[in-house]
Amino acid sequence: MNRRYALSLSGALLASSCMTVLVAVPVARAQQASTAVTSTAASPAAAPRQILLQQARFWLQQQQYDNARQALQNAQRIAPDAPDVLEVEGEYQAAVGNREAAADTLRHLQQVAPASTAVSNLSDLLSERAISQSDLSQIRSLAGSGQNAQAVAGYQKLFHGGKPPRSLAVEYYQTMAGVPTQWDQARAGLAGIVASNPQNYRAQLAFAQALTYNTSTRMEGLTRLKDLQSFQSQAPVEAAAATQSYRQTLSWLPVNPDTQPLMEQWLSAHPNDAALREHMLHPPGGPPDKAGLARQAGYQQLNAGRLSAAEQSFQSALQINSHDADSLGGMGLVSMRQGDTAEAHRYFEEAMAADPKTADRWRPALAGMAVSGDYAAVRQLIAAHQYTEAKQKLATLARQPGQYTGATLMLADLQRSTGQVAAAEQEYRGILSREPNNQLALMGLARVDMAQGNTAEARQLLSRVSPQYASQVGEIEVSGLMAAASQTSDSARKVSILREAMAQAPRDPWVRINLANALQQQGDVAEAGRVMQPILANPVTAQDRQAGILYTYGSGNDAMTRQLLAGLSPADYSPAIRSIAEEMEIKQDLASRLSMVSNPVPLIREALSQPDPTGARGVAVADLFRQRGDMVHARMALRIASTRTIDLSPDQRLSYATEYMKISNPVAAARLLAPLGDGTGSGAGNALLPEQMQTLQQLRMGISVAQSDLLNQRGDQAQAYDHLAPALQADPEATSPKLALARLYNGHGKPGKALEIDLAVLRHNPQDLDARQAAVQAAVNSNHNSLATRLAMDGVQESPMDARAWLAMAVADQADGHGQRTIEDLRRAYDLRLQQVEGTRAASGPVGAHEEALAPPSTNPFQSRGYGHQVELGAPVTGGSYSAEAASPDTSDQMLSSIAGQIHTLRENLAPSIDGGLGFRSRSGEHGMGRLTEANIPIVGRLPLQAGASALTFSITPTMIWSGQLNTGSVYDVPRYGTFMATQAANQCAGHSSCGGLDFLSANHTQRIAAGAGEAGFAPDVQFGNSWVRADVCASPIGFPITNVLGGVEFSPRVGPVTFRVSAERRSITNSVLSYGGLRDPNYNSEVGRYARQVYGHDLTKQWGSEWGGVVTNHFHGQVEATLGNTILYGGGGYAIQTGKNVQRNSEREAGIGANTLVWHNANMLVRIGVSLTYFGYAHNEDFYTYGQGGYFSPQSYYAATVPVRYAGQHKRLDWDVTGSVGYQVFHEHAAPFFPTSSLLQSGANYVASNFVQNALPTDYLSQETVNSAYYPGDSIAGLTGGFNARVGYRFTRNVRLDLSGRYQKAGNWTESGAMISAHYLIMDQ
């Protein structure tokens, strides 16, 4: 429940007028400033300096410090050391928070003019700034709730018995005016302020209102109020308040020849004021003339100290009308001055019963009788929230002669208000045992019984209450129901109780707002709106508007809140309403200025530089950014506000913690609430008021649930349960902890247990749509699709106008494979939610097993479990899509954003699509051998299945590859290709006298050497995939010399938060033209080749073919993936076998571990950083291009450690994703034979290596390798590795998207780069 809902609200004019400073209207008031200056500076002798100082003070009151500084600087140029200039300089420095500079100015002023009034004025101001804001806030709360006597005592304690500081004087005397016994002192104090500064309109208003409180001065007060109404341009706020006070005072007047013209004049200007017209026709209390005159005379005599005459006059008035509240109150004042406390108490009670509307006028008088002595001390303790000491004091007082009833009543009321209901009941019953008909005790005990749900007992007690308390009895019955509702966390029971209360008081706005709030907590937002609709559409009373403001504020409807505030007089502001009005003003002002700056930080600091005793200012600034989706600056505002002072008040802590919860930061909220302890004052922190206690408990339950959910998302269900357990035990009836427990079981891979809990909650309250949604999802997770559909359909039938019912239906329909119906469900949910957000909702509506399911486990059921998250081994840091991690909704409503995202994703998943692109790839290496250039044109078609949960994809990719021409002039390159070693040897032997075994070849002509060419083909592919299995059948490009059938399958089941990934696949190795498409040996059909086959016959034919290469890897891999918050962990390994045509068989083992974490993100961007450790090794080194080699990087051991960094973001239609990595690698390659698959070819190579050098010149060496042996040498290399991969996409329309990508990689002994442009087109618009 919103904290403001729990605050007390005063409906009477007296209570509202005794609060804090009126809120200023946020409009440009330069003209008003000049008008005020002209009025005060009417004397021709007024110096320009005085005018400038008056302007500076005006702008200081408006909190427009730049304008104030300019006016002050102009005055300083005229007379920098004038006392009045120094005084205003100190005022300015104190206002902007520079206390040290203000203290220096005061010291300078004491030196310049030690005897001037400026010294005392500035000293008072700085003393006020040193006052504890939390204490001042508590005192103002007392005044706002009508406890004026206690508030006055609190002020006096705050001022150390001295006079009030100038800035607090008005509110101090205004509060004092509400205490009848101190009214004379208050009038004198306000009169002095007005006399010294006639342009202080707030003081003028307070003085006029105070005069209306007393019958003898009421007419003078009316005259002053009427005069104030004419200052619409100079003081619009005070003028409006004066109008409201004037109207209220008319209803207090008797109808006689003196007052009737005033009423008729009002009605001529306000012809629709039916209440005043009824007052004139049927004045309360019978004939008004004689009674009114007698009452007026009584107050005049009372003010003159003629108590006997005053008593006689009041008795005369009561003989005419025994229910005249003003006369009864007058008799109470007379009795109080005569020292007859009991009689005064009786009269005041009767006065409040006679006219409940003016009851707040006499409650301070009742309290005032006990201001002296021990009772005054008790009230001071209560005002300071020192409830334990106050109760001890009252218990002592009750034992004194004649004090039992009064002290015990006060003690019982205090116990009841602080939640000690049982103790209060005992005290009330003790009073009734002595005084069975004590009306106050009967009503107090009835309140206790109502709060405990003992309705029958409460009504029996109320039946003994005198009829004169009929209105109070009705209020007790309703308030009892409301109290009972507030004490249950069972949302269904709460709604039922409040509906009963609304049936008894259908026009009571506070009953309606409590019911609406309960319905919102239950999730029935539409019904909550219908409950509030009558008072929102047609607010009749000020309390209607007050309740409406609280409701719309709590719903986040700032526009409607401002509209309702515009129709409410500032005189009717309660502390809560005033706080909201200030928040709306702050938001409006800050929003208008934000549009003119690029960096909001200076504005945030300026807005938060003002005192914030209740936390409203910090909440306003943070909430403005939260509503805009700017969580970074929302968090910054809260951090600045909450660390501005160490001594935060309870209101500040509760307000800031509530806002932290709105921006999903339960850790910060918990840290703020820690100093409050349990709220009782027994341990850490002071005792809280009941409404503060309720807010604290609700916040702590919300924090427990939020922290549990956060840890559940991280996969740490054990720690999540530890956070949740206190909430489960503290309130067994609360549903939110139970649903959180179900989510824990769901996250732990036990959807059946989660379903059991959700269903138990749902049976207890079938209207709980949150529980229904959870049950539907749990049923789907448990493969109970028919149950999910039934639950969802029941929800739609019961709540067809609630978006959540259709969201649950969408889950069930998608599980059943009904894609189109799922989109229709989501669209209907979106429309309903949009109506709710915009405020345009159309009005249309066996037990033991359950309890076992609902009961929290006796021990932590999630202990010693792992974590899980999906990630690909060895891949750059990904961690899921950008939208899932950092994208923030364009709208401030999270549900709308979520639904829109689901519709968008499902629409794409359901729409068949076609993709086309053009890609290029280049890999380093020697021309004709390792160098690779590739161009491909992928064409992909996708057909969704099972409501988008699966898809069938067809693709064909025309592909061209080439390696360039072999350098045939190089004696180093030629022997390392195919079988050209023999050809090169033959050519170099030609012309020599003897070549040993090559004499035959030397007699022939030189053989032509040529190699290196391009290949082209097209690769078909058919794929099927869903959330846990993917499979495909494809082929390497058809048209290449060697074509292979390829494919693979991957299973990725998820058990709770842990994902296990197992795959088996057969893929081409695309390192080179040799490994990818295979090569034809040009020497096979040459003269040398034919000669060799002729000589060696069948033995060579078996070991030598016309083609070799086309290598595929048959790979088996397993991996486990986990997550811990924003950190992703993974590890796995595998084994592979490489085969190819006429290529040596090879094998590979590989393993890797890694982690990455989200280090920064905002609404539209994210940065992740990680670390990856990789190992693999092959049995044979086949990274060469002679016959039998594979042409792919295959070290015998490879180790690498890399640090990948990913930056992704989106802006409107543009999105991007860039990953870069850098690291260090070490690998080792063994020596390898030239011809690993042919012993004859290798023996020939050995022969050439050992004999050819005898007949060749040094410049004719076949190659360095042949000098000593026919082996490629091994090698060990260490160095840097790294690269980048970048993609940028742009969506032109809902159906067309274009992507550009590029990459570069340096690893092993190679580098590779690539680029692609591709287009994506959705064929059908779902």
UniProtKB/Swiss-Prot annotation:
Residues 841-867 are annotated as: Disordered. InterPro entries: BCSC_C (IPR008410), Cell_synth_C (IPR003921), CellSynth/LPSAsmb/PSIAsmb (IPR051012), TPR-like_helical_dom_sf (IPR011990), TPR_rpt (IPR019734). Disulfide bonds: none annotated. It comes from Komagataeibacter sucrofermentans (strain ATCC 700178 / DSM 15973 / CECT 7291 / JCM 9730 / LMG 18788 / BPR 2001). It is a peripheral membrane protein. One of its GO terms (biological process) is cellulose biosynthetic process. It is found in: Cell outer membrane. It comes from the Bacteria. Required for maximal bacterial cellulose synthesis. It may be involved in the formation of a membrane complex for extrusion of the cellulose product. TPR repeats lie at residues 49-82, 291-324, 325-358, 405-438, 557-590, 701-734. Pathway: Glycan metabolism; bacterial cellulose biosynthesis. Residues 1-30 form the signal peptide. Belongs to the AcsC/BcsC family. Its main location: membrane. The gene is bcsC. This is Cellulose synthase operon protein C. Keywords: Cell outer membrane, Cellulose biosynthesis, Membrane, Repeat, Signal, TPR repeat. GO terms for cellular component: cell outer membrane.
